[in-house]
Amino acid sequence: MQDERRHYQGRVSELAIVYLGLGSNLGEREENLCQALTLLSRKVSLEEVSSVYETEPVGYKEQPLFLNLVCRVTTRLRPEELLHLAKEIEARMGRIPSFPNAPRPIDIDILFYDNKIVKTQNLIIPHPRLQERAFVLIPLAEIAPDLVHPEMEKSIAELANDVKGQSGVRKLTGGFDVSAICGRAL
C-alpha cells in the first residue's frame, strides 16, 4: 500500500528540495548549461551542481554528443510552476518542440521534487525514465548517492551502479565551477 502522504497535494508552504537534470547538445554546450543555471537561479535557490558529463545521445543517435549535469535546488514553486519555468527557459534559449530525443540547445527535466510522487497529464515525478538513464543517474549519484527513489525504494547509488550505458558517460576533467564558467557566482 502506498504512503499517500508522499503524493503531492498542490500546496507548498516550505522549501522543497528538487533535483533537476540539464542537458545540451547544440551550440555552445557549456555556455548553454551556464545560461540555464543563471536563469534558473533567478527563481530558485541553486544549492549544488554536479560535474559535467559528456554523453552519447539516447534514442536518436544521429546527433552531437550531449553535455549533462544535475543540480539540487530549493524552491517554493509548486511542481507545475517549476515545469512552466523550465519550459519557459528552454523556449527562451531556442528549443523548438520537435520529435522525442531530438537535438536541443537545452533540456531541463524535473527528476525529483522532495520525496513526492506527482502524476498529472503534463508532469510525472519522479522522472519516468530516470532509472534507465546513465546520463542522469551518474551525475545525480555524485551529489545525492543516498537519495532514495520513492517508488523503486532504491538509492540513486544503487540505480547508477545497475544502469546500462555507463560507458557512454564521460566525466569532464576539472568539474563544473559555476563561478569560473559563468564568470560570477550564482
Q: What would you call each of these model-derived segments?
A:
Residues 5-10, 50, 57-65, 83-84, ...:
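Flexible, gly/pro- and Lys/Arg-enriched active-site loops
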Residues 4-43, 50-56:
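N-terminal beta1-alpha1 ligand-phosphate binding loop
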